[in-house]
């Protein structure tokens, strides 16, 4: 019998969907190596491999059979995706054009040889970032530069603004995936994109207020408020928006600081200075990464208290998703302080979910973990923290939790989302 690869769903799926992988037609107990590869839009090659042994019927199902070694070991049905590593140092897998899929090649090789044995079977699978029927609408309204993703149908849908960090530009992959779950999601750029500022030393909340107004006025967006989804600097900005602006019902804060960092933030007659930092506190790891976790001043001490975001003004529901090994900044500390501050002012206690051995970039499911990555403000890659498997598990859980949270607070219901390792 000729070996064949079985993938479910067949042919294509959304990136955040689990993929069932099985091989049939092998010899009983046959040792094989499974290998995956994809290229991103910049030409970087991402690969993973794992060694397996077929069962007594010559079949191999990754949901039931543990890997014996390779890029990972143990029972990891999605390991061949989340364990991928780039052929370029410190290169993160980022989908830049969500209108095209990542094409994943899967090969089955005979034996457990490091360089691969005879090719037994091969399959190609497309991993899409826009579910069928999701619409992509570029937004250039007033000063707002963004892309709005709308689910199939007429709506109205609960609205979310999606914000990333200091890398700048316009990243759409999280918004496009989330639109497939029934949300109208606007990926919002705020610098280093189109005619927006090229630097981030000054930010005006009026720009973000304009984005909120635009989204709430859209005929396919359900009011009375919108949700915010932010990571890193985007999470910090989400907290500022929730504190100063109207129309924010719920906010998911992924590894964010409850203090204004790097830039000076202005809103009308008020301003928050950037928190002081000491670059001499940077440590360099044995691998040559910069560990910046200790460079920020403690915002609870004068004069740095002026940089604290006035969360007590907000009536927004908050969900903090925290990587406990985040080395970008002390995310768990900031989440705990936010909870204390909100409760001290009679506000609702926020949800805080902490993930052990999880680093800074908590992404949608199955996006590979990175130990370190370049940073706009440093000349060497900075340490992001985390461990591959724990980080992968955290991403699956966080993706489910944020959807449930938004459905609860923006739609008034609670829907589970199918995702698993």
Curated annotation (Swiss-Prot):
Disulfide bridges in this chain: none
Functional pathway: Lipid metabolism; fatty acid metabolism
Tissue-specificity statement: Highly expressed in spleen, brain, testis and proximal and distal intestine; expressed at low level in the liver.
Keywords: Fatty acid metabolism, Hydrolase, Lipid metabolism, Peroxisome, Serine esterase
Induction comment: In the liver and kidney, by peroxisome proliferator, via the peroxisome proliferator-activated receptors (PPARs) and by fasting.
Molecular function GO terms recorded: carboxylic ester hydrolase activity; fatty acyl-CoA hydrolase activity
Cross-referenced InterPro entries: AB_hydrolase_fold, Acyl-CoA_thioEstase_long-chain, BAAT_C, Thio_Ohase/aa_AcTrfase, Thio_Ohase/BAAT_N
GO biological process, one term: unsaturated monocarboxylic acid metabolic process
UniProt GO cellular component terms: cytosol; peroxisome
Catalytic activity: hexadecanoyl-CoA + H2O = hexadecanoate + CoA + H(+); decanoyl-CoA + H2O = decanoate + CoA + H(+); octanoyl-CoA + H2O = octanoate + CoA + H(+); dodecanoyl-CoA + H2O = dodecanoate + CoA + H(+)
Stored Pfam families: BAAT_C, Bile_Hydr_Trans
Family: Belongs to the C/M/P thioester hydrolase family.
Purpose: Catalyzes the hydrolysis of acyl-CoAs into free fatty acids and coenzyme A (CoASH), regulating their respective intracellular levels. Mainly active on medium-chain acyl-CoAs. Seems to be involved in intraperoxisomal regulation of acyl-CoA levels, but not CoASH levels. May have a function in termination of beta-oxidation of fatty acids.
Protein name in the entry: Acyl-coenzyme A thioesterase 5
Lineage of producing organism: Eukaryota, Metazoa, Chordata, Craniata, Vertebrata
């Amino acid at each position: 019998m000729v070996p064949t690869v079985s993938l479910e769903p067949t042919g294509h799926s959304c990136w955040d969907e689990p993929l069932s992988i099985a091989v049939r037609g092998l010899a009983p107990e046959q040792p094989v190596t499974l290998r995956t590869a994809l290229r991103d839009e910049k030409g970087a090659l991402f690969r993973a491999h794992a060694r397996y042994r077929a069962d007594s019927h010559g079949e191999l199902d990754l949901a039931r059979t543990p890997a014996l070694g390779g890029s990972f070991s143990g029972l990891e049905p999605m390991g061949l995706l989340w364990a991928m590593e780039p052929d370029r140092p410190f290169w993160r897998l980022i989908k830049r054009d969500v209108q095209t899929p990542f094409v994943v090649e899967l090969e089955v090789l005979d034996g457990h040889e490091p360089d691969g044995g005879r090719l037994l079977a091969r399959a190609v699978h497309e991993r899409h970032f826009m579910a069928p029927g999701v619409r992509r609408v570029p937004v250039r309204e007033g000063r707002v530069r963004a892309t709005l993703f709308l689910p199939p149908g007429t709506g109205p849908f609960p609205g979310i603004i999606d914000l990333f960090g200091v890398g700048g530009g316009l990243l759409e992959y999280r918004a496009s995936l989330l639109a497939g779950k029934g949300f109208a999601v606007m990926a919002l750029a705020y610098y280093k994109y189109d005619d927006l500022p090229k630097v981030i030393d000054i930010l005006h909340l009026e720009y973000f207020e304009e984005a909120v107004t635009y989204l709430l006025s859209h005929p396919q967006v359900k009011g009375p408020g919108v949700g915010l989804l932010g990571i890193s600097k985007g999470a910090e900005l989400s907290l500022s928006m929730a504190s100063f602006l109207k129309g924010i019902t719920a906010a998911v804060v992924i590894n964010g600081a409850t203090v204004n960092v790097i830039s000076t933030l202005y809103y009308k007659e008020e301003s928050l200075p950037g928190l002081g930092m000491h670059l001499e506190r940077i440590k360099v790891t044995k691998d040559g990464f910069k560990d910046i976790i200790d460079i920020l001043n403690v915002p609870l001490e004068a004069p740095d208290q002026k940089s604290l975001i006035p969360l007590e003004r907000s009536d927004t529901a908050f969900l903090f998703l925290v990587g406990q090994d985040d080395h970008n900044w002390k995310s768990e500390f900031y989440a705990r302080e936010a909870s204390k501050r909100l409760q001290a002012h009679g506000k609702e206690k926020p949800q805080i979910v902490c993930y052990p051995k999880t680093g800074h970039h908590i992404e949608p499911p199955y996006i590979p973990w990175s130990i370190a990555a370049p940073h706009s403000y440093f000349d060497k890659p900075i340490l992001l923290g985390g461990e591959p498997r724990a980080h992968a598990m955290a991403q699956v859980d966080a993706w489910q939790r944020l959807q449930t949270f938004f459905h609860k607070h923006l739609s008034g219901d609670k829907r589970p989302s199918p995702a698993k390792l």
